[in-house]
Regions:
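Conserved catalytic-core segment of NTP-binding enzymes
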Residues: 2-97, 106
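Residues that form generic nucleotide/phosphate-binding pockets
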Residues: 4, 86, 117, 130-133
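Generic recognition of short, well-ordered alpha-helical interface segments
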Residues: 49, 82, 122-125, 129
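Active-site donor-binding loop signature of nucleotide-sugar glycosyltransferases
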Residues: 100
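C-terminal boundary of histidine-terminating zinc-finger modules
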Residues: 110-121
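C-terminal alpha-helix
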Residues: 126-138
Length: 138
């Protein structure tokens, strides 16, 4: 897998690798050189602590990560103060706060792809903004 990802990186300008939740893909070093590591978390203290562990593991095993960004997903309302304080203590840029979106839940429940989200969807708009931000920074 590592060789395939390296070869794709030599061929294409952008390679997106979507992994399951957790740290196994980092500890296995499936990627060696990462322009942007997006660490996706739910808006909980436990999720933020896990994001911090993932970030630290990438440094410990010397994966060459150029930039790291935290993305909060399924956020309802304002972030509680303790959560915001935990985020502020991280050595991670908060790249995006994707709002909870009933349309995402509906599509998921029906087994339909998220590509069917319309451009007026709050989560669609936020992800679009995030993509623009990433493309400017890498």
């Amino acid at each position: 897998l590592r060789t395939i990802i390296d070869n794709l990186g030599d061929t294409y300008k952008y390679v997106v690798v979507d992994n399951e939740a957790g740290m196994e893909h980092i500890s296995r070093r499936t990627t060696r050189d990462v322009d942007m590591l997006l660490i996706i978390s739910d808006p909980t203290i436990r999720g933020i602590k896990t994001a911090e562990s993932i970030s630290e593991l990438a440094e410990e095993i010397e994966v060459n990560v150029h930039q790291k960004m935290l993305v909060l997903n399924r956020v309802t309302g304002e972030l509680p103060e303790p959560l915001q304080e935990a985020i502020d203590k991280l050595d991670l840029q908060l790249g995006s706060v994707i709002p909870a979106d009933p349309k995402v839940n509906e599509l998921d429940a029906l087994g339909k792809p998220l590509t069917q989200l319309t451009s007026d969807s709050p989560s669609f708009r936020e992800v679009e903004t995030l993509i623009d931000k990433i493309l400017r920074e890498i």
